[in-house]
């Protein structure tokens, strides 16, 4: 699970959506958290605990959303030619 603290909303937006967003790290985290949830037969995957300007928020998804999130990660890996991660994601999709 990703744990991050941001001093401002701008810093938060830049991390997730900015030009230099760490998208591979974000998708790796999503895949890993869903993998854990599937392995432990959990209904929820917890992606992140974030603090933005002192306000805490949790980011998670429920089992019906696992496939969509994994497909988004798979598309990201394909578009960015990170093929070595595709098989693991497809294996997780097949488990659902």
What are these regions (language model features)?
Residues 13-62:
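Short, charge-rich, low-complexity alpha-helical interaction segments
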Residues 7, 11, 22, 41-42, ...:
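Alpha-helical structural elements
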